[in-house]
């Protein structure tokens, strides 16, 4: 009888050590998984060193954990064993979601002693997140904000040679089958019991899931937790990694896409980001909640600026902190400036991105849309001394992963394919364009995508354009949040932020219902109806005395000034003309631009031109500081339109209709001055 009792006690303690689950191993059948080559079974790997609970720590350490906001790991099932002294039965810990006070749980201590610690009840139907934590214990109340991580400690049965394994379940412990799981090279799917197995070499440092339709993962300071970092880089060591999901109806959803924030603690960038970008995003969050629409976001790279990671002590860690208060799920992809400038190796230089954000490439599903996030910067940084040279392309592992991922996507689906460097170059006025991606990989990827409808989304250029490649594929190259690296805001005293093509700084909003996708460019700090800007060219003369008047600009020759005035210093192009110039920020081939003068419809010509306002607020601003460093001068764009009027002072009605039938209209009264926005705020 004593022996039987001893066995029962031992078995009970083992259950507690495993996180309080009712079964020790799963009923998963460790067969070769779909999407992964079975091959010859490898010899068994090394056992992962088990974590053995030590003696309970002092109560003061628990107080420190809460007050410092450190992570709290709470088991999915059973009881929560807190290995601290000083608790007593009846003590309470209340956790409340920071951004949703209606989600709150009071966890009660059921028993406690200084030998085994305290045992608390656990929350139900909860996957964790950023929470306010209030602990009423030890005769005191302690408050902090922590990421609460719901951990599934369920022991999935091992299979020899498959050293990365685990399961995917919902917050009730029910298995979720058919979920794509990968280590960044191999791809598999969960079986009927929610289990997966990978023969991982662990060289990409993560195991991650492609979050399935109508589910969500927990969010840690705006970053979705769809991944686990390997504990060891030794491929021979077995590692168990389980994932917990919550159901979420998201067939209808909204997506915010931004790129090129380029925060670097210079040119007043942090203030501009805080004053203009963040309130805009907060307004979108509030709007989506009021409409009952699920909202997500994607950041397409160049989120910080590698050159200033060390010079100005602002890196991706700081960027993460600056977005951490958004009540938003933000997926990120790396840009060429998101690499360590002291490291001459593509993979190693991206360590900061992986550490602070997420894997370099991955996929997820929201509603009927399959999202793919890619890393198309092959970073060389020759010599490791801030050279920052790179080329466009994908690693072999990334291509291997992409093939495996797409094999699990239903043909005919809509894919949003995110990357930093664009797939295509901007179009010319006649609508033609060339490709930016190298031909070999471009051809291979487009072949893989040929059975799907694809929207490429990209950044990098600090310009705005949309190219329709064929009936199934198009690209949205999205202007930068920073505009011209925050300089135009700096020069204009925060009255305008412009990209090199004259597009105001902003982001793109996609409204999605099942496979129906609509979009609209949104200018920061302006109403969504602000979609174009019109110039009275007769009053757009740019002169040195008006726009470059500083006495100390001796470096700027008249010839240099004229070169970067972009023709607007010529009277023949300005004061003697009757033309109107219109910059339509998000124009594509299915938009219409119409202009009438006194009821008469005028001929509208699409041209390749340069924006006058950007010419003033970067080119002139730079020269006015006695600098000839034209690092980001005004660039050409083909979303520019020119109209010849019959009179010089007549009003004209400009009507722009986008591809979805939304109409943007302005009655332009002339003469209209070319405003210097550092002095007058008109646009």
Annotate each language-model stretch with its function.
Residues 17-63, 147-160:
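Bacterial Sec-dependent N-terminal signal peptides
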Residues 35, 52-153:
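Ser/Thr/Pro-rich low-complexity tracts
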Residues 81-86, 155-177:
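Structural motif
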Residues 97-104, 167, 172, 178-189:
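Short amphipathic beta-strand segments in non-cytosolic proteins
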Residues 109-113, 185-200:
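Short, acidic Ser/Thr/Gly-rich low-complexity loop/linker segments typical of extracellular
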Residues 155-163, 214-310, 683:
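N-terminal active-site segment of His-dependent metallophosphoesterases
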Residues 155-164, 220-237, 259, 281-287, ...:
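Metal-dependent phosphoesterase/phosphodiesterase active-site architecture
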Residues 213-242, 308-409, 436-455, 463-513, ...:
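Extended active-site neighborhood of metal-dependent phosphoesterases/phosphodiesterases
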């Amino acid at each position: 009888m004593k022996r039987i009792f001893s066995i029962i006690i031992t078995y009970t303690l083992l259950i507690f050590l495993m996180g309080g689950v009712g079964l020790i191993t799963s009923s998963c059948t460790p067969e070769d998984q779909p999407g992964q080559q079975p091959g010859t079974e490898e010899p068994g790997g090394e056992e992962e060193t088990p974590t053995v609970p030590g003696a309970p720590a002092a109560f003061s350490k628990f107080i420190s954990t809460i007050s410092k906001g450190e992570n709290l790991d709470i088991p999915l099932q059973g009881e929560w064993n807190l290995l601290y002294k000083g608790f007593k039965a009846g003590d309470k810990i209340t956790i409340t979601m920071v951004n949703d006070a209606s989600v709150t749980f009071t966890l009660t201590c059921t028993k406690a002693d200084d030998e085994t610690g305290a045992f608390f009840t656990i929350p139900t139907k909860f996957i964790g997140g950023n929470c306010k934590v209030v602990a009423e214990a030890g005769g005191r109340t302690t408050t902090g904000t922590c990421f609460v991580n719901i951990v599934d400690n369920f022991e999935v049965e091992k299979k020899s040679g498959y050293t990365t394994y685990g399961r995917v379940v919902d917050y009730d412990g029910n298995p979720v089958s058919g979920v794509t799981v990968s280590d960044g090279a191999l791809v598999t799917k969960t079986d009927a019991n929610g289990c997966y197995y990978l023969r991982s070499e662990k060289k990409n440092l993560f195991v991650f899931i492609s979050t399935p339709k109508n589910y969500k993962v927990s969010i840690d300071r705006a970053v979705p937790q769809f991944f686990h970092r390997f504990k060891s880089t030794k491929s021979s060591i077995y590692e168990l990694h389980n994932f917990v999901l919550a159901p979420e109806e998201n067939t209808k959803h909204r997506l915010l896409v931004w790129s090129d924030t380029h925060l670097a603690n210079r040119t007043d960038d942090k203030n501009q980001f805080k004053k203009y970008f963040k309130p805009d995003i907060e307004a979108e969050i509030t709007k989506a909640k009021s409409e009952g629409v699920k909202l997500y976001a994607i950041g397409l790279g160049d989120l910080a600026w590698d050159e200033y990671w060390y010079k100005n002590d602002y890196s991706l860690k700081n960027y993460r902190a600056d977005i951490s208060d958004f009540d938003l799920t933000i997926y990120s992809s790396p840009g060429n400036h998101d690499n360590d400038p002291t490291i001459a190796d593509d993979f190693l230089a991206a360590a900061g991105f992986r550490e602070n954000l997420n894997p370099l490439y991955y996929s997820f599903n929201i509603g009927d849309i399959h999202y793919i996030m890619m890393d198309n910067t092959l970073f060389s940084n020759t010599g490791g001394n801030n050279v920052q040279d790179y080329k466009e392309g994908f690693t072999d592992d990334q291509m291997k992963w992409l093939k495996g991922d797409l094999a699990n996507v239903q043909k005919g689906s809509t894919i949003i394919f995110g990357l930093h460097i664009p797939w295509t170059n901007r179009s010319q006025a006649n609508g033609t364009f060339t490709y930016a991606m190298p031909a070999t990989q471009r051809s291979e990827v487009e072949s893989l995508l040929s059975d799907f409808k694809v929207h490429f989304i990209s950044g990098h250029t600090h310009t705005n354009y949309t190219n329709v490649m064929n009936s199934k594929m198009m690209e949205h190259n999205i202007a930068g949040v920073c505009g011209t690296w925050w300089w135009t805001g700096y020069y204009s005293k925060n009255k305008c932020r412009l990209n090199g093509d004259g597009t105001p700084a902003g982001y793109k909003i996609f409204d999605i219902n099942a496979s129906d996708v609509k979009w609209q460019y949104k200018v920061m700090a302006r109403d969504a109806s602000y979609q174009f800007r019109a110039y009275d060219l007769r009053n757009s003369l740019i002169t040195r005395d008006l726009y470059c008047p500083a006495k100390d600009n001796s470096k700027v020759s008249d010839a240099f000034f004229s070169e970067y005035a972009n023709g607007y210093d010529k009277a023949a192009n300005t004061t003697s003309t009757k033309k109107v110039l219109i910059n339509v920020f998000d124009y594509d081939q299915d938009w219409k631009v119409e202009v009438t003068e006194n009821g008469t419809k005028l001929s509208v010509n699409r041209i390749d031109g340069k924006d006058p306002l950007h010419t003033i607020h970067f080119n002139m601003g730079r020269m006015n500081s006695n600098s000839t460093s034209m690092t980001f001068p005004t660039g050409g764009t083909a979303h520019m339109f020119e109209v010849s009027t019959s009179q010089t002072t007549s009003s004209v009605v400009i009507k722009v209709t986008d591809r979805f039938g939304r109409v943007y209209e302005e009655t332009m009264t002339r003469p209209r001055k070319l405003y210097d926005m550092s002095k007058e705020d008109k646009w």
